[in-house]
Amino acid sequence: MVQTPVKPLTLDEFLKQPETKPASEYGDGQITQKPMPQGKRSILQRELTFALTVDFKPDKIAQAFPELRCTFGGKSIVPDIAVFIADRIPRDQNGQVSNSFLCHPNWTIEILSPGRSQTKVLRNIFHCLEHGTAMGWLLDPEESCVFVSDSPQSVQMFEQPEMILPVPTFANRVQLTVGEIFGWLTE
């Protein structure tokens, strides 16, 4: 019996599909589902989103969005935290935050989950950087380290607890150390 190959979905066809839980991402004709959030990732995502919001909100500099679908450059990804500076946040006709973000974040933050490919996550970060994102972080809770990149050609690893992590220039009020971030897992 001859099997007809299944035609891969286009990005537009993917976006018309119902959302999945956990979220699915699209790139290069492939759909991949993110792993189900687990304890460490959930705590880091919650606490980091809160910490960023505390720093951003007084001056309305930016907003941190957990699990926000960002579609740009032929891909549709869902960073664990997507940060947008205030004037780049899409708005609807009523001036409210749009439900659809057809643009790259200014800062993308991913948290490595058990069983998730570090390469796949880095590809998403590099895709963001190639399309205008200022910085990407990859938190590895099992190794208590943070990989920081401001271009696909440059990745730095931070693992000393007292190390203050670099941030994009718009976020210069944010002063977080490796120890503070991974300390949230023991609270």
Where are these regions (language model features)?
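Gly/Pro/Ser/Thr-rich low-complexity, intrinsically disordered segments predominantly at protein N-termini
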Residues: 1-187
